[in-house]
From Swiss-Prot:
PANTHER family assigned to the protein according to its UniProt record, in alphabetical order: NADH DEHYDROGENASE [UBIQUINONE] 1 BETA SUBCOMPLEX SUBUNIT 11, MITOCHONDRIAL (PTHR13327:SF0), NADH-UBIQUINONE OXIDOREDUCTASE ESSS SUBUNIT, MITOCHONDRIAL PRECURSOR (PTHR13327)
Positions of transmembrane segments: 89-109
Basic and acidic residues bias spans: 66-77
Region annotated Disordered, chain positions: 40-77
Signal peptide: none
UniProt keywords, alphabetically: Electron transport, Membrane, Mitochondrion, Mitochondrion inner membrane, Respiratory chain, Transit peptide, Transmembrane, Transmembrane helix, Transport
Chief localization: mitochondrion
Entry similarity comment: Belongs to the complex I NDUFB11 subunit family.
Function: Accessory subunit of the mitochondrial membrane respiratory chain NADH dehydrogenase (Complex I), that is believed not to be involved in catalysis. Complex I functions in the transfer of electrons from NADH to the respiratory chain. The immediate electron acceptor for the enzyme is believed to be ubiquinone.
Official protein name in the record: NADH dehydrogenase [ubiquinone] 1 beta subcomplex subunit 11, mitochondrial
GO cellular component assignments: mitochondrial inner membrane; respiratory chain complex I
Oligomeric and partner information: Complex I is composed of 45 different subunits. Interacts with BCAP31.
Coiled coil: none
Gene: NDUFB11
Length: 153
């Protein structure tokens, strides 16, 4: 079973390498269990000859290596002076303005979902009810005398 699976996968790999024009190593594998020999087919090794092309260097390379001219380049500009100033501006605004002013803004945001206000209001009502001798909580949330129910039919 294992020899059959290995043989199938080896053939598939060799066929894929041959169709893509990749160099493939010839594989010969012998199983110690069943004396099965797995070797690539002779068809997989035959490839059409590659077309010959003349090698010509590009007279004007498109990508210019900035590190050859300025080894301390930060990648903002080709000019070393502008590159340093752009780097300083980015870090100043990134660190000073965004982090410092951003955290200050978040710290002074208003009460989210009014949690602090509801706590203060509950403490105020508890003090008022204790001072006037009223129960802290009533069983009825609404005054039953003010509720108007529909008449029975």
């Amino acid at each position: 079973m294992a020899a059959g699976l290995f043989g199938l996968s080896a053939r598939l790999l060799l066929a894929a390498a041959a169709t893509r024009g990749l160099p493939a190593a010839r594989v010969r594998w012998e199983s110690s269990f069943s004396r099965t020999v797995v070797a690539p087919s002779a068809v997989a090794g035959k490839r059409p000859p590659e077309p010959t092309t003349q090698w010509q260097e590009d007279p004007e390379p498109e990508d210019e290596n900035l590190y050859e001219k300025n080894p301390d380049s930060h990648g903002y500009d080709k000019d070393p002076v502008l590159d340093v100033w752009n780097m300083r501006l980015v870090f100043f605004f990134g660190v000073s303005i965004i982090l410092v002013l951003g955290s200050t803004f978040v710290a002074y945001l208003p009460d989210y979902r009014m949690k602090e206000w509801s706590r203060r209001e509950a403490e105020r009502l508890v003090k008022y009810r204790e001072a006037n001798g009223l129960p802290i909580m009533e069983s009825n949330c609404f005054d039953p005398s003010k509720i108007q129910l529909p008449e029975d039919e």
